[in-house]
Amino acid sequence: MPSSSDTALGGGGGLSWAEKKLEERRKRRRFLSPQQPPLLLPLLQPQLLQPPPPPPPLLFLAAPGAAAAAAAAAAASSSCFSPGPPLEVKRLARGKRRPGGRQKRRRGPRAGQEAEKRRVFSLPQPQQDGGGGASSGGGVTPLVEYEDVSSQSEQGLLLGGASAATAATAAGGTGGNGGSPASSSGTQRRAEGSERRPRRDRRSSSGRSKERHREHRRRDGTRSGSEASKARSRHGHSGEERAEAAKSGSSSSSGGRRKSASATSSSSSSRKDRDLKAHRSRTKSSKEPPSAYKEPPKAYREDKSEPKAYRRRQRSLSPLGGRDESPVSHRASQSLRSRKSPSPAGGGSSPYSRRLPRSPSPYSRRRSPSYSRHSSYERGGDVSPSPYSSSSWRRSRSPYSPVLRRSAKSRSRSPYSSRHSRSRSRHRLSRSRSRHSSISPSTLTLKSSLAAELNKNKKARAAEAARAAEAAKAAEAAKAAEAAAKAAKASNASTPTKGNTETGASVSQTNHVKEVKKLKTEHAPSPSSGGTVKSDKAKTKPPLQVTKVDNNLTVEKATKKTVVGKESKPAATKEEPVSTKEKSKPLTPSTGAKEKEQHVALVTSTLPPLPLPPMLPEDKDADSLRGNISVKAVKKEVEKKLRCLLADLPLPPELPGGDDLSKSPEEKKTAAQLHSKRRPKICGPRYGEIKEKDIDWGKRCVDKFDIIGIIGEGTYGQVYKARDKDTGEMVALKKVRLDNEKEGFPITAIREIKILRQLTHQSIINMKEIVTDKEDALDFKKDKGAFYLVFEYMDHDLMGLLESGLVHFNENHIKSFMRQLMEGLDYCHKKNFLHRDIKCSNILLNNRGQIKLADFGLARLYSSEESRPYTNKVITLWYRPPELLLGEERYTPAIDVWSCGCILGELFTKKPIFQANQELAQLELISRICGSPCPAVWPDVIKLPYFNTMKPKKQYRRKLREEFVFIPAAALDLFDYMLALDPSKRCTAEQALQCEFLRDVEPSKMPPPDLPLWQDCHELWSKKRRRQKQMGMTDDLSTIKAPRKDLSLGLDDSRTNTPQGVLPPAQLKSQSNSNVAPVITGPGQPLNHSELAILLNLLQSKSSVNMADFVQVLNIKVNSETQQQLNKINLPAGILATGEKQTDPSTPQQESSKSLGGVQPSQTIQPKVETDAAQAAVQSAFAVLLTQLIKAQQSKQKDAMLEERENGSGHEAPLQLRPPLEPSTPGSGQDDLIQHQDRRILELTPEPDRPRILPPDQRPPEPPEPPPVTEEDLDYRTENQHVPTTSSSLTDPHAGVKAALLQLLAQHQPQDDPKREGGIDYPTGDTYVPSSDYKDNFGSSFSAAPYVSSDGLGSSSAAAPLEARSFIGNSDIQSLDNYSTASSHTGGPPQTSAFTESFASSVAGYGDIYLNAGPMLFSGDKDHRFEYSHGPITVLTNSNDPSTGPESTHPLPAKMHNYNYGGNLQENPGGPSLMHGQTWTSPAQGPGYSQGYRGHISTSAGRGRGRGLPY
């Protein structure tokens, strides 16, 4: 080491390392004295005047840093690059290293002269700036180049204390640019190369660093020798000082200032030489080092006072460049020697090293013993020959320096760049190598043009450096010795780069004032060396970059003198132990440097539009530059501070963002998993923290769970119940399939993950983790695996419990549920999240009575300050508030409160309160209960888009309190408040918690309801239950999931009990003739007594009956299509025998149900299910016939029925008020219902035809289809009471005959009933008889059947029964209503008829519209919870039936049987709307259903008008 350093120094000055250090110290002292600057100025000025064009760019950089440094850099680089600073800068940047060596040699004489000239030229301004404008001049300069920083810092010292900091900064920045932008950039790049090399030196070994230092010394000897001599002569320093500068320049690889001065020229050239002739220049530089070292000593001598000031500067800069300044100046000189042999540039560096020696140990070490060591240190700090400030900046700028590397890549100022710079600064030698690799096209360009010029300059500089070196050898030897001692102290203080840097920073801070003075004194010499270094760095980085660096460095030096000095002082204290910290701190400076480098790199790319050249004059005008620099420097200082903080951050750049992101979204998990699998080290750490924190997100496989079964289906996958194999804990796995995701991970899943990870509340579902179904990320990617969101398991959801009929919630339970629900919602809203999908199936309940809000797939962040549109197609229709229905897009959290209000009503009524299948129908239902939206109650409603297009048919007054009188007063107040039409008047979740109903509720202290512990009641289970009942309790459909909507449409297969209930619409249509017939027949509305008699005679008389004959006997008008279908159907004798009675009763039932428009297929279906397919065919035929018969009857009976309904609706409505779930036994319930209902209805409807209302336990789950929506149902309980089905029976002219027939049928059906019960679980006769009362209770709730409307049939079905009533004959409608009720809930037929007059037709029409094939609704769609109370279900006739008119709604009982369309339709409107159903009466709407009508199919939707809703 010493020998190498000696060689470097000795090469320059023939002095021992200690002597050189002494010389450098002496020089620094001299620099400290203000006398030298005047000398330098006269010398530099004339020469600078010669290369003024090139100097301006350098000056621009130099002036901010230090005018003298800029001048030196300008002189050094301008002599070479004067013609084209920008281009040269690019070239230099490209050819940082090799040109460095070459340029150093070339610079030797010529470069030295030019450097001196530039120094002279720049010195005056540095002095001008330096005297008072050091901040501007000095500030700009240091930013530019690390190598130049030493010389520039010297210049800055010459400039003055303030300018010293600035000059130190500018020295790095401007010094490098001093010769020209190109030269400065080249110098910067060289400095970067040197910096990088020092890093590599660190990485490699002290040997490498020694070699590189030697090379740097050699190169710097040549380069900085000439440059330093030139710079000194330019600066007006004595020949000895010049010689010393040259020596120190050669030793400036260890010493910072000469590096910057001579390094400006020689470092730029040396960098090019390094890049181009790295090895050659090494050998050559090994030869040259003596002169270079000799010259650097002069530079050091000249810079000696500068080095001190520079050290101060560098120290002050050390936080940014300061660390590197002290270490870098020393290290830079060493690194330059070792790397570039930018030691010539390091000639200035040697003074820096001397100054740095003030962070002395590092500097002296680096210089004398550890050129290699220092190169390692230089890796951290002295990458550039110039002092740390310039070298560090360059370093950071240089691709090899932390900043440089970064700059080579991105040159971002981010802490990440500083992080990168850390690693690079760690290995400066490697940096220098990487520097070569990092040579960018711009660098190459600099190499080509700038390298040549630099080589020429190097020669001139070498000559000058040789001259100056000889003269300055003596002085520089002393200065070098001093600098070496100081550097050794600094390096010792900060053995690691960081330590050196920090020590240097602290020392530089302390010495910065001195350095500023020295820079003022030494400003002239330092610019020459600084110019060399800067020119190298200028090569490395364009002048613009240099200018930015200078600006940043100036301010940063000033600010960071304090900051970095502070940091460096503690660092110096901790230096060796803190080497890691030092690394981070150097990284911080390098980070600042990187950012500067990045700017410089950007500038390099932007060299053509070099703003710096124009600014070079500004640099000459140090004040303007200073202002710019100060601003930039302040920014960079701030950035540096931030960078320091960032550098201190433990996480890699990706972690902060990736951590949360990867953690929260499964996507990121997937990425993390994939990455971790692919790159476990990278991904593991990146996402590992997250995964570890979040239970190894994505690392766990779904195999960790035992999947027990499917419990639900979401928008993007199934939900499974599973057990954790490790803990035994029950969990819910929500599957997220990526198979069909063209856009990648489903946005709903992303939203849910992101939001749920931000929500932690006892009333909000907890997402535990995310797992995949692939253990290997590659397999996952190949096979498009699935993600599983792991949630805590909840035993039930509210919908499943309400539909199951297994649970009764009392007021306390409802209070507890609502309290928990509103607490969770209030938490969401306070977190500014809108749930936007609150419904019963998304409210989960465990066996402990805890409520949790789930399914945040539609949730989104809500900004109350920002009014921006959101989609209004959110929230399930039944729970959608009126503002969304009217097109509001700037909604508020009030939308969720409305949904909760609907749930509150549903908890009391056991059914959805607003069940429509279309938005217009939903708004109509809301208007009937809550009043029509109007400006009087809702002033802003007129602003809504659909206010004029979605107006209800009529204006309704608000009668919510009247409709829900049965609700406790406190609950009713809250209910009324939550269902305010005007969202601004609606209560908030927080206000709801303060209301009387919920104020004092403590759910934890309230006993949970008696929940079915043996059965988990989920929506999917409930739907399956409905289907099973529809399928005749077969398990075939158990696996099939029917959406709640479909169920509500009339998928209530529990009534149909025929597997056909599940058939697709097309099949259902075709089969309705044969297979569906039994269903239709079962629930078929009662025919006229004469018709029934005829049918009975026909069926009994013939062993087999052709349906065509059957139609003829019944005098039914059939269209040709239906006739053909009937011809194909023959009723087997067996069917007649077994199903004869069933058919007969079913026929009357069909007739009544058809007239009612309700669907009562379940009764017939039950018997038929047991019977053969032939029976089904017979029933389908009967359904068709009966539909047509009923159509005719309905037209006649409509009026009578309407009248009777009006008459009878009065008494039956109260009966219907009965609690819906109560019918425990079909018999008893029937009796009660019969008593409540007119016994006429019972008489009218044969007992066999009447479905029994089974106890909730025995009843099949309510089909999704709500019971026929009767007016009772719509009216909820009140109106249900008002709409008795008996009136329709009274109206029926053939009421007596029908009653007799019904009795006969009932007698026959009792036998069939068991079959029906088997299929439907409802004894038709018994259940049906009580249907009137149940209809009040269940009918109302069921007819409102929430699920029907979800399909869209619900509301229409409700309307349909009303219309059907009016449309269909009263008696028919009554029976239909009764029967439909039976089918839907097996309620007494009479009740249904009461509603069905008006409603039946509407139901039929509604069903037709909803179901393309026919208006019939599926009872399976009905909610079972409502099924019990539902009265008669109106049977919708097949829309297919051409003859199907409004009256024909009941003619297709078969189809209706399958799906209980009537019942579903009635329920769909919702209880309240059905209650209003009387108003809905539009008899014309109820169309007859053709045989082909399929209840399952939403044929009603196809019908278009058959909704049965008045609107």
Curated annotation (Swiss-Prot):
Residues the record marks as active site: 837 (proton acceptor)
One Gene Ontology molecular-function label: ATP binding
Residues given in the record as ATP binding sites: 711-719, 734
EC category name: transferase
KW Kinase (keyword) present: yes
GO BP term, pick one: negative regulation of stem cell differentiation
Pro residues bias: start-end ranges: 49-58, 1253-1269
Record SMART domains: S_TKc
Primary location: nucleus
Catalyzed reactions: [DNA-directed RNA polymerase] + ATP = phospho-[DNA-directed RNA polymerase] + ADP + H(+); L-seryl-[protein] + ATP = O-phospho-L-seryl-[protein] + ADP + H(+); L-threonyl-[protein] + ATP = O-phospho-L-threonyl-[protein] + ADP + H(+)
InterPro entries: CDK, Kinase-like_dom_sf, Prot_kinase_dom, Protein_kinase_ATP_BS, Ser/Thr_kinase_AS
Pfam families with a match to the protein in the record: Pkinase (PF00069)
Comp. bias intervals (Basic and acidic residues): 189-198, 295-309, 512-523, 564-585, 660-670, 1197-1209, 1233-1252
Location(s), subcellular: Nucleus speckle
The protein's name: Cyclin-dependent kinase 13
Name of the gene encoding the protein in the UniProt record: Cdk13
